[in-house]
Amino acid sequence: MQKIKLWFGVCRPYSLFISASPVIAGLLAFRKIIDIPTAVVTLLCAMSLQVFSNLVNDYYDFVRGCDKAGRSGPQRPLAEGIVNEKQMRTACIVALSVALLLGAYLVWVGGWVILLVGVLSALFAWLYTATRFSLAYLGVADIICFLFYGPVASAGTVFLQCHEFSLAAFYAGCACGCIAVCVLASNNIRDIEDDRAVGKRTFPVRFGKTAAQVGVALILLASVAFAVLGFGTLWLLFLLVPDIFLYVKLLKAEGKAYNICLFRFVLLDVLYVVAFGVAFWL
């Protein structure tokens, strides 16, 4: 039981909703009867890829010397000596294997389009911190984060249901993708000095803390606009209220307070999906 609890924490369970939200949002925007088995497998596959991405990220950040014991961010298992490198590599293989098994069913349902999406998703999850050309170190992770935790996931989910492109699902996914970028931004603003020291050229490192904060404000505004477009109802403008509250908290944050901001943005993602659920029934 203790070992299960340990690995559950290593997988960063709080992050799983970031991968689940565009899948759920896409299904809600679809507004039609869905094939439940396909929807469930889609959700599990997305979450498996998220776990794989988390584990790979932990492994390569440790190998590169980016993660160290006593860091200001959430505890990292390798850096703290909780698990060793061999165990982490094995966990990466297991997570990827689960995603591939689930993905095989989705390819059978959706064909070559889903195969392409799946291959790119797994590839970018690996490339995020792996190899000398890792996306996180090149400063383009925000774009990939928006796409694959947003419109790619939501539109792909609906394509599996009807083999058609859904603009509503695309917009709903864009809203989720924006919040995912805010989660990443909270992490990167917090780690700006540590990342600069190891050559990790994130957006805050390249353009500064102020530019990153302004970027978050614009992204939050865009998320509400996409939500309204996806569900065609102006009452979703109420999402501006929690957006403003969390943005003010982000501006005031220092050090480990960014960890609270990060988790609050995850909760904001939950709120968005709940709001989409209400919009679905109205």
What function would you assign to each model-found segment?
Residues 1-41, 45, 133-136, 141, ...:
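Topogenic membrane-insertion module of multi-pass membrane proteins
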